[in-house]
Amino acid sequence: MQKILDTLYQGKNINQKQSEALLHSIIKEKLSAIQIASALISMKIRGETFEEIIGAVNILLTHAKPFPRPNSLFADITGTGGDNSNTINISTTSAIVAATCGAKIIKHGNRSISSLTGSMDLLKQHCLILNSPQQARKNFDELGICFLYAPQYYTVLHRIMPIRKQLKIPTLFNIVGPLINPSKPPLTLIGVYKKELLSPIIRILQLLKYNHAIVVHCGGIDEVGLHSPTHIAELHNSIINNYILTASDFGLDSYPIEILRCYSRKQAREYMINILKGRGKPAHSAVIAANVALLLKLFGYTDLRANAQLALEKIHYGIPYTLLSSLSETKIQNHATHNTR
C-alpha cells in the first residue's frame, strides 16, 4: 500500500487495480486519516483518472448494503456537488417534480460535504433520510419515489465524512457518489462539477451497462442550466453521443445564474418548498423544469419542450408539494407504528 501512496504523492496516476486496493484499505480501516486525506488531495490536484474512478466504484459497489431492487424501470437524478455555486438544490427538487410527471425515482444522495447544502440536508428536515431499505422500497412502490442516504448503505462514507468536511474540496468520493446508487438504476441523470468529467463518467456508465444515461455540466454547475449552454454526454443502447442544449431547446427563457443563489440552508429549504408549492421564482421553476425535461427523456419522452411544460404545469398546481407531504406522513406513521410495538 505504501507503494501506491508514494505513486500518488509523486503526482502520478494509479491503475484500476491499485485504485481498488486503495479503496479496499480505506474500507478495512487500514489507512490513517492523514493518509486518506493525502491520497485524495494528490488525485484532486492533477485530476482523477478514468481508472482511478472505476476502481473505486467497483470496490464500493461490492460493499453496498443490499437494497430490494424493483423490476420496473426507474432512474436516479444526482450530481457530484463540489461546484461551489451555492445554488438552490436542483436535483432533489427535480426528483420530486419528476415523480409527479410519472417518472419512477430512487434518488441516492448525501449530506453536504463541500457545498452549502446536500440533498439529504433538505430531506432530513422532512424525516426522509433514515428509512430502512424496506421502508424506502415501500415508499417507492406506493408513491413512485424514495431516497437512499449514502452512509446508510456504505459505512465507509460515514467514517470518512469528517475528513472530507475538513478538506472542504471535491474529491474522488464526490465523483464516485453518483455512480454507486445501491439500487443499481438502469437510468440516471448525473451532473458533474467540471466539464472534463463528462467523458470518464459516461464511459463508466457504459461499462456498468446502464440502459440510458445522461451526464451534464453547465457553466460551472453540476446541473442542466439556463444561464449558459449545457454540455451533454448521453449513453443509449451502448452508444455515446455528445451535444449541447440551450434554454431555447426546452422552450424556456434564459436567466443569469445569480438568480439561483442561496446563502443558507434555511433559505435553500424555503426556495425548495416554494417551488414545490408553485410559489417559486420563475427562474427557479424554469431550471427545475429543464432538469425534469431531460430526466423524462430517459424514459422515452423525447420532446424536451413538452416535458418542460408538463413539469411547469405540475409545479403550478403545487402537486409536487403534496407528494413531499405524503412522503413525510408515511415516515411519521411508520415511526409511530414502530414505537408502539
UniProtKB/Swiss-Prot annotation:
Tell me its EC number(s), please: 2.4.2.18
Q: Which residues bind Mg(2+) 2?
A: D222, E223
Q: Which UniProt keywords apply?
A: Amino-acid biosynthesis, Aromatic amino acid biosynthesis, Glycosyltransferase, Magnesium, Metal-binding, Transferase, Tryptophan biosynthesis
According to the record, cofactor stoichiometry and binding are noted as:
Binds 2 magnesium ions per monomer.
- Pathway(s) the chain acts in: Amino-acid biosynthesis; L-tryptophan biosynthesis; L-tryptophan from chorismate: step 2/5
Record's catalysed reaction(s): N-(5-phospho-beta-D-ribosyl)anthranilate + diphosphate = 5-phospho-alpha-D-ribose 1-diphosphate + anthranilate
Highest rank taxon of the organism: Bacteria
Kindly list the GO CC terms recorded for this protein. cytosol
Annotated anthranilate 1 binding lies at: G79, N110
Write the protein's name.
Anthranilate phosphoribosyltransferase
Give the species: Blochmanniella pennsylvanica (strain BPEN)
